[in-house]
Amino acid sequence: MSKLKNGGKENPNPYSEERKAAAVWAQTAEEADSVLRERCGEVWRKATKAQKDAIYSYTRGSGGFNRPLRGHDRFWGNFKGVGKVDLNNEGRGAAIKHMTDLIDKSTYDRDIWLQRGIETAEGAASFLGVPIEALEKWSPKKLEAELKKTPKTEHAFTSCGSAKGQGFGGYIFRIYCPKGTKMMYAEPFSHYGYGHKRKWDGKKPQTDFGYEDETIIQRGTTFRITKVEKDIHGQLTFEMEVVEQI
């Protein structure tokens, strides 16, 4: 595991309130695109056919990638344990490697916020490593205290929306990605995006955007939960930071 590096003249602590407040937090898909697209194009143009095929397949359906990485055998809920399921269990072993290699090349020289939505309590509880009861019955204060104790490692790829309100709903995770975070903007080539999909040349722009508006954080990323909030409608929002990656 390698610790994230940081440089430049700003506050040397990437997790300072100053850096987090100044980070890019796109309010629209267009704003996110203006920040993320150029680097994505550079990486895409240099990618191999196998790498492009792999990440495009992921955007079409991520289950065959993420289930074995999380230790589920062929369907969600059939949990065997992380590392106990062959990564080629659903025929995606080579694609997982190609996608990992591709995302390794995609980093930004800016601090960026992303938003992830998990629609079910089961999914959110699994992501956080807590019982469902904790989400449904604990106070935000108690839940925050528990989650702050231990950083959480997501062994699978983490799909996020690239701007506020983008991506899926349900339990909302605001994810702070300090400069150097390995992640790839996928909207230009995503199967469900409004870009040019797999045929994208790494240069053509777009003016409309899909609701997923996806950016994918590298698999094996460790997150630190820093805040839990509940609004008047009972919706839980979690703030977290990328602290370590493979």
Feature map (PLM): residue ranges:
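Mono-ADP-ribosyltransferase
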Residues: S2-I246
